Amino acid sequence: MKLVTADQMRQIEAAAFASGVTPEGLMETAGRGVAQAVATRLRGAPAQRVVVLVGPGNNGGDGLVAARHLYDMGAEVRVYLLTPRAVDDANLRALRERDDLDIVELDEAKIASELAPEVQHADAIIDAVLGIGRGRPLEGIFAAALDTLTQQRGLLLAVDLPSGLDADTGAVDPHCPAADVTLTFGYSKLGLHLLPGASHAGEVEVLDIGLDPALGADIDTEIMTADWARSALPGRPLNSNKGTFGRVMVVAGSQSYTGAATLCCLGALRAGAGLVTLAALPSVRAAVATLLPEVTYITLPEEDGVPAPDAASVVAGALPGYDVLLLGPGLGLSDGSQALVRGLLAAPAVKDLPVVIDADALNTLARFHAWHESLGTRAVLTPHPGEMARLSHSSVADVQSRRIELSRENAAAWGQTVVLKGSQTIVADPAGRTLISPFANPALATAGTGDVLAGSIAGLLGQGVEPFEAAGLGVYLHAAAAELYASEYGPSGLLASEVAAGIARAAARLRREG
């Protein structure tokens, strides 16, 4: 599903007007769409009592059009004007021509005596107060009227955006209502899918208002959906063998972090990789082999418990037989581990190979100037906010306040696909394409889940999925696996190994429901 900022939506509308679409016609289509969506949801309500809160500007105009169509459909409609409309407002005039349609010019004195009781007894309340043009804090009659919506028992539907929700950032005003449904026009707005805005948007339905699809051809930001993920899934032909589904080389783990190596391999296998080989120290190999008999091994030479100077050449010599390299989880930051990372990334065999770079490999790179110049052209970097801060010489606070912008900027600057992990993980590529995960699941906030994610992305790359799509699909399946767990057990207690098992279930569900 494509997402737009407020400015992008204004530009699309301006282009539509330049092509001959009229503002009045667009508003009529939008308001009629709102009315039809409300009526569809109220078919089981005998009285269909509808309250419409109308603000200034186009959002209020959409509400007036919706009120007219709902009245004409037989609903009992009451309209509350929070501010005076223009004397020549054609949509308001059309409402006044209809008998038994109450229009109340609201003031603060009427909120408790008139609006609040109506809100409590309505089958549906339409928030058509403020839309993408909001730029000020809610106060006065706007704040007081919207606060009554916390008392509603019927369905609360927002027109384009819940009033007080920032279309670009998802920030919400303290008086912003939590809608059951948001009926947004043309394209969904970015802020509806970013926390905390997503928690106020409810179900988001995009209404077709007749815009030429060509006007949105350049939109490069999407929210991941099941349909998108299904389209990215690699095929599983019947006439196949393990080589068909990719050979993954994993370089991970150390004496202190054997579990990281296990989880990476497990993630790759559960994502469908045909063969997974772990290149690791003898102690790591021994630990993983007891848990994963499906994995093959390359034993790294060691000195004093860390990779020896020739460890990188051992792995590089084997890489021509592999389709993807995963590097970093649990390696630690010893001199030997850092030399292994730098040596591998400098190896000619790696330059044209898809590489997933995670955890300690990222921390190693962050210590060197212009580190990204040593990479090939097909890397996927998977930092958490702390690692992103180190890589970009920023702070965690800055990373978290500019997750989308920083992901895009760094993907372009580094020439690689970037996966910024966290609640609603962001995936960006050098061309500016951006994917946003719809999932924010605290069950994933546990050790080892990032290792599983890195492994799953590597497993998908090995099956021939392109880096941007592999990163997005890996993120989606990883989070969907956690959702399956949380639906049964709640938001805590999930183990990283259970996420890996859930990846195969999530993929099967996509295929089954497609």
Which residues make up each language-model segment?
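Small-residue (G/A/S/T)-rich helix-start motifs and N-terminal tracts that mark the onset
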Residues: 1-82, 181, 192-359, 363-380, ...
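Short Asp/Glu-rich motifs
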Residues: 35, 88-90, 101, 115, ...
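Nucleotide and nucleotide-moiety/phosphate-recognizing core
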Residues: 36-129, 137-159, 346-351, 372, ...
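Short beta->alpha connector loops
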Residues: 84-85, 108-109, 163-165, 188-189, ...
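Internal gly/pro-rich beta-alpha loop/helix module
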Residues: 116, 122-124, 129-220
